[in-house]
Every structure is written in C-alpha cells, then in structure tokens.
Curated annotation (Swiss-Prot):
Gene3D superfamilies: Anticodon-binding domain, Bira Bifunctional Protein, Domain 2. Its EC number is 6.1.1.21. This is Histidine--tRNA ligase. The lineage of its organism: Bacteria, Pseudomonadati, Pseudomonadota, Gammaproteobacteria, Enterobacterales. NCBIfam families: hisS. The keyword Nucleotide-binding applies. Homodimer. One of its GO terms (biological process) is histidyl-tRNA aminoacylation.
Amino acid sequence: MAKNIQAIRGMNDYLPGETAIWQRIEGTLKNVLGSYGYSEIRLPIVEQTPLFKRAIGEVTDVVEKEMYTFEDRNGDSLTLRPEGTAGCVRAGIEHGLLYNQEQRLWYIGPMFRHERPQKGRYRQFHQLGAEVFGLQGPDIDAELIMLTARWWRALGISEHVSLELNSIGSLEARANYRDALVAFLEQHQETLDEDCKRRMYTNPLRVLDSKNPDVQALLNDAPVLGDYLDDDSREHFTGLCKLLDAAGIAYTVNQRLVRGLDYYNRTVFEWVTNSLGSQGTVCAGGRYDGLVEQLGGRATPAVGFAMGLERLVLLVQAVNPEFIASPVVDIYLVAAGAQTQSAAMTLAERLRDEMPGVKLMTNHGGGNFKKQFARADKWGARIALVLGESEVADGTVVVKDLRSGEQTAVAQDSVAAHLRTLLG
C-alpha cells in the first residue's frame, strides 16, 4: 500500500466546520473596512527575494531565518511572501497608484515563515492587512486604530484586547538611540544571552524584544527611546495620543515596543491579548514613511497594519463563542416519495430566488423520514420542509420548526414569507 501523503508541518487544512467560522469573521472585518472607504488589492504570494531583503531588512529574523526562498528554472531567487506590506508597496509603485495620490487598500491571504509551529502561529498563516498612502498626519494613524477598535466591538472581544503604543522617531533619532543602547549593552555583556549578543551589533533594537527575564530586568536601566525622539516625531505622537483620548480609546505607552521589521518609523502599535494563555499580539502596525522611496518610488508617507487571522479566530472562539454559533444550513428540504424529487428541487430553487442569503439544502440520496430528519439535524438546520406526494398534488409544503417541534402546512406560493417570519 502506498504511503499516505500528509500536509507539511505547520501548514494546515481548514475543514468545512472551520471555514464557516472564518467566513463569518472575515465578513465582519471586510464590512468595517468598506465603511471606512478601503478597497481590496490582490497580490501574488511569490515575489522576488530582493524585495523583502530591501523592505524588511537583511539582519532581521524574518530575512535571516524564516523566509521560504528558492531559485526558479531561470535561476532567479524567489520567496513566498512572509508579510504583505512590501508586496503592496511594490504593486503601488509598479502600477502608478501612489505618487501624489491618497490610497486606502486592504488585502487578505496566506503568508509563509519557517518558524516553530505553535498554537496560533504556523508556517503558513493568514493575514488581513490595511495600508494608507499619501497621508502623513497623526489623524490617519488614529483613524486606523479606531478602525481596529471597531472590529473588536463587532466581534465582541473588546474586553480581551489592549492597545500598546510607541514612537520610534526618525531614522536619525533611532541611529542616536542605537548608539546609546549599544554602549549600555556593551557594559553588561555578561547578562546577555547569545542571541542578544549577536543582535547587539546587527540590530540592537531587537534586544528590547528579548523574552529572557535577566535581559528584561537589565533593560529597566537601559536608555529610553523616547528621550531621543526628534521634535517632529514627538509632536506627531502627542497629536496621536490626544486624538485617541478624545475618541475614548485606552492605550499604554510601551517604550520597548519597536516592531520586528526595519521599515517602521514614528508610530508603532500593537493590540495584545492575555486570553490565549501567554500574551500574544493580535494586530500590529505603524508608520513607514520611507519605504516607498526605499523600493524605488517617489517619497510617499504611509501607515498600515496587519492582523493574524489564526490568532483572531482562536480569540473569538475562546471569549465569544456565540458570535460563531451559526448553523451550516437554515432549512432542510425533505422529499418523501419517488415522484417528489423534481418538485422539491423546483421549490428549492424558487426559495433561493425569493430569499437571497438563505442556506437551504435539499435531501439527495433517498432515505425514509427518519434518515432525512437525521441529516437535517446533522447539518444544524432550524427548519425542515416536508414535501410528499399529497403536498405536491395540492400545492402545499409542511413547515416544521426543528427546535419547538411545531409544524404546519403552508401554500407553496406563500411559504417564503412564512419562513422569513420563523427565521427572524
């Protein structure tokens, strides 16, 4: 017998019961994006490797350790996208969407990173991202955060996420801070683990992300990035905080929040949760005013965020299961008798025309009443329609509420109105 071929570790199948949950959550996210004027852009999952090296930074963990990179038959180096912003910027430059224009874009799809699979973090994972180009004030940063806060309210998880903010300033301000941080770390190398010692000279701001408790204790005495901010960045951040205060959005300023990608400047933020065990990031983003020019376009201010959908789905399932308790099928049509199948299918098509969005399944494969009602239960139907030969003859159908057990015969011409009342 041939050996079964299984999915690659860290790359998961999502089965019908799971995809229904994803679709409900994604539909909510997309509706909110539309209400803020965002348009969808669809991007390739494979890009030229230099795109990510230039955008993300060659000495980041993503580029050094996590990218899926390969040569194609022409010898070109290609990479499965590890994130969405770089590809979105590349597309904007290539198609002339950015210079002297305002764009509000969103995308959704799989990303790929070769890291250790764990709950909510996989090698193929899904992100929804939003990017704004052409606006540089703190007001658009605030609106993006307000948009995400509206998501949490719509999903019923507002009480289980919290917002952390920081400003990492301009490129020059970060360079000055980097020098001060390296000088401090050099004086305390005995406390650093090997990973932090390596990062100290390649990307010292990443030391601030260390989970090592000894390093975290040491960093309590380290220089603070906020002390090195340029005046424009400080003014920008103050403006953002005032707008969030006015909107009633609570936040914590986290001076160690720097993000893992090199293209960020000024505003960075994360929505985090403690409701999935250890603290985890649900959504994160910030401003990246230099990236468009860095990738070959004209200088264009930009800000955006990305959200991991696997972690969001887990969070909604954990804290608001009622949101996703939606049946696969609203109505199950039971056809009793050999001569009724054609009439049943005709009635089902008419109801789909008259009730757009209703989830109606017609029984196929025969079976007695008991078997057909068992199938209706399996699919989670709320209502069964029973069509026998006598109902076909007199133009009626029996409508049975599978929760209360009540049933009544209704004329086929008026059954749609009756069903709308039952389904609410």
